[in-house]
């Protein structure tokens, strides 16, 4: 957490760590960002980059992603979600984004289930020999762990994508 806290502090946000420096719990107070351009390394976690992409909408920000995950699944999921919320952004090269200050414009949004967590239930279906359905999850998911279902398919499992969700039998 220390890296993202430092990045946000350097952009003009006040963060007071209540216990150990660089860790939860902390208090954030801000009147906006002093910087209009930031760079974040995705090697540690692409979640920080995703959070920054979402927060950029509130103030307007140019973001440069560095590291190995600049084009990873979670970055793609975040950008897709922003589009669904009506957010416009400009992508320069593979790793640079310009997001102007805007408003989110979607009143209802179906959050896709976490495929990492769903894998346990799908694996359990093999052990107990019962069908398992995870609602609102589909094979066109952008989540990287969806590949687990293709591995199950190769092992002979029936993987069926229905309107309701994915069933393993």
What does each model-identified segment do?
Residues 1-169:
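Structural preference for solvent-exposed beta-strand-turn elements
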């Amino acid at each position: 957490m220390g890296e993202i806290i430092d990045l946000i502090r350097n952009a003009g946000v006040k963060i007071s760590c209540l216990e150990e420096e660089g860790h939860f719990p902390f208090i954030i107070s801000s009147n906006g960002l002093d910087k209009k351009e930031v760079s974040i390394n995705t090697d540690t976690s692409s979640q920080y980059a995703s959070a920054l992409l979402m927060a950029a909408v509130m103030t307007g920000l140019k973001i440069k992603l560095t590291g190995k995950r600049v084009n990873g699944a979670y970055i793609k999921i975040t950008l897709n979600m922003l589009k669904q919320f009506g957010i416009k952004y400009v992508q320069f090269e593979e790793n640079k984004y310009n997001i102007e200050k805007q408003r989110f414009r979607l009143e209802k949004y179906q959050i896709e289930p976490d495929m990492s967590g769903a894998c346990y239930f799908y694996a359990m279906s093999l052990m107990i020999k019962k069908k398992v359905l995870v609602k609102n999850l589909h094979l066109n998911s952008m989540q990287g762990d969806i590949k687990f279902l293709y591995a199950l398919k190769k092992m002979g499992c029936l993987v069926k994508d229905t309107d309701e969700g994915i069933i393993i039998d």
